[in-house]
Amino acid sequence: MNTVLSTVLFAIGAYLIGSISFAVVVSKCFRLADPRSYGSKNPGATNVLRSGNKKAAILTLLGDGAKGFVAVWLVKHFGPDYGVQESGVALVAIAVFLGHLWPIFFRFVGGKGVATALGILLALNGWLGLATLITWLVIAYAFRYSSFAALIAAIFAPFYYALMFGPDAILLAVVAMSVLLIYRHGKNIGNLLAGKESRIGSKKK
């Protein structure tokens, strides 16, 4: 199979995997309100937690993280057999992330990408993902703001990658994901500056 075609097919598959919104699916399974209708209106684990159902929030978190991990893991392990190179892995990472942000199955209304980005980073390199996760945990524990922790982790992730592996195509993908994640947190940034951002564990209003 042609290398370019293989790369494109892996990327399309990754986008479709990313388009599965676990926040919406899990909420329906638990007969909860659509997460796009309350709280931050973001279909993500933090907003599902505002429903008061911790199990649903955990499943959402795991699902969103798993889809990022699986998409990148598949191309890393099977892509080389079809000629997919490092740039192809970078493209797949971006594709699954874009699927989460703008899912074709849910009218292109998706989440902010925190859990999916973490899954992607873990698949790219375990130490990279772990360093980014620890950054999030430390900031979240200290300040109790999930969004603020995500922003700080997003800023540090490219630096972690650059320190570990230097400049390459995957670094560009990590930078792109960080920029998109920060962009998707625009409203949260405004709320943080205004002192109106919801803290971790707060219930929906």
From Swiss-Prot:
The chain crosses the membrane at residues 6-26, 55-75, 89-109, 120-140, 162-182. Pfam families: G3P_acyltransf (PF02660). Pathway: Lipid metabolism; phospholipid metabolism. It is a multi-pass membrane protein. Keywords: Cell inner membrane, Cell membrane, Lipid biosynthesis, Lipid metabolism, Membrane, Phospholipid biosynthesis, Phospholipid metabolism, Transferase, Transmembrane, Transmembrane helix. Probably interacts with PlsX. Catalyzes the transfer of an acyl group from acyl-phosphate (acyl-PO(4)) to glycerol-3-phosphate (G3P) to form lysophosphatidic acid (LPA). This enzyme utilizes acyl-phosphate as fatty acyl donor, but not acyl-CoA or acyl-ACP. HAMAP family: PlsY. This is Glycerol-3-phosphate acyltransferase. It comes from Herminiimonas arsenicoxydans. The gene is plsY.
